[in-house]
Amino acid sequence: PEQTAPYGLGNPPRRRRRSLPRRCQCSSARDPSCATFCLRRPWTEARAVPSRKSPADVFQTGKTGATRGELLQRLRDIS
């Protein structure tokens, strides 16, 4: 009776994340795996590297090393 559960009524209370300076602290400064984990940025802060190519160009030519013309010629040769 002291606490009422709001089943579907309104929005549930949201908890705010505490802003901490670091994820964790290593017990030994010489531990590379701990240092890598503790000092790594969260994925939300990661930034994409800008590219001059469109995503389609990277997908089509990035893995094969072929230019647009070479790719088009290969497709013509197949058919």
Curated annotation (Swiss-Prot):
User: SMART domains under this entry?
Assistant: END
Secreted as a keyword of this entry, yes or no, is yes
| Main function | Endothelins are endothelium-derived vasoconstrictor peptides.
Protein name, UniProt field: Endothelin-2
Primary location: secreted
Give the top-rank taxon of the lineage listed in the UniProt record for this protein.
Answer: Eukaryota
* Alphabetical list of PROSITE patterns matching this protein: ENDOTHELIN (PS00270)
Q: What keywords appear on the UniProt entry?
A: Cleavage on pair of basic residues, Secreted, Vasoactive, Vasoconstrictor
Which InterPro entries does the record match to this protein? Answer: Endothelin (IPR020475), Endothelin_toxin_CS (IPR019764), Endothln-like_toxin (IPR001928)
- The signal peptide here is none
Q: What family is reported?
A: Belongs to the endothelin/sarafotoxin family.
Q: What is the lineage of its organism?
A: Eukaryota, Metazoa, Chordata, Craniata, Vertebrata
Annotated region (Disordered), positions in chain: 1-23, 51-79
State the compartments where it is located: Secreted
Q: Which GO terms describe its biological process?
A: intracellular calcium ion homeostasis; regulation of systemic arterial blood pressure by endothelin; regulation of vasoconstriction; vein smooth muscle contraction
Provide the Gene Ontology terms for cellular component. Answer: extracellular space
Keyword Secreted carried by entry: yes
